[in-house]
Design a protein with these regions (language model features):
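Secretory/organelle targeting and membrane-embedding segments
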Residues: 1-211
């Protein structure tokens, strides 16, 4: 989850929390749970929320070597931020889920401010086949699914195709499916609408927060 902007006028409140609590806990863990949870047993909101909780309980505690944090240049000069603040504006973490489905599969979470772009994406890298037909080194870009959640919505499927000619040489391409022509509700407007209708699927339950 990358943001081009800094903390702007929220220096004091942001400095008391940081990227882990503001972004990872509130946003990225929700995305992680939706992406990796088992199918819910019913269509009710509580069924999906139950699966999210079980998923988070299976997340292994993150080791110090798998956690990197930092600040963007100029963060400490923001009004409300202490001159010796150690609060992170960037975080990258590697975690594992101790379940049969996700055993030994590394999952990376990254979030930061003052990044080159503003975008929230999920990148799923597929396992490599036991043998490459082209006999050349193939990067992960040739076998992935990329899901952009914001600011726009699209899905990209990474493939490797043969280049024209006699030689067996491939190149990486990405097929993109873009959602267009549909007016998307602003995020908080959707949440408020769900709250008024009693739909709790997108809300964090207490046991989810504690997990």
């Amino acid at each position: 989850m990358a943001e081009r902007t800094g903390v702007q006028d929220r220096g004091q409140s942001y400095d008391a929390t940081g990227a882990v609590r503001v972004v990872v806990q509130n946003h990225l863990l929700q995305v992680l749970a939706v992406l990796t949870m088992d199918p819910p047993t019913g269509v009710q909101s509580e069924a999906a929320r139950d699966e999210k909780v079980w998923l988070l309980k299976a997340v292994r505690p993150i080791a110090a070597r798998d956690d990197v944090r930092g600040q963007y240049a100029g963060y400490r000069s923001v009004p409300g931020v202490g001159p010796d603040s150690a609060t992170e504006s960037f975080v990258a973490a590697r975690l594992y889920i101790d379940s049969w489905r996700w055993a030994d599969v590394p999952i990376y979470l990254r979030a930061g401010k003052k990044m080159p772009v503003t975008a929230t994406e999920v990148w799923v890298e597929f396992g490599k086949p036991p043998r490459e037909t082209s006999g050349e080194h193939v990067s992960s870009a040739s076998s992935h699914m990329r899901m952009r959640i914001s600011p726009d919505i699209d899905i990209g499927l990474g493939l490797r195709v043969k280049q024209p000619g006699e030689r067996m040489v491939g190149k990486d391409v990405e097929l993109i499916l873009t959602r267009s022509g549909i007016a998307n509700l602003p995020p908080y407007q959707r949440l408020l609408g769900d709250a008024l209708r009693g739909i709790g699927q997108l809300f964090a339950r207490e046991d989810f927060v504690m997990a």
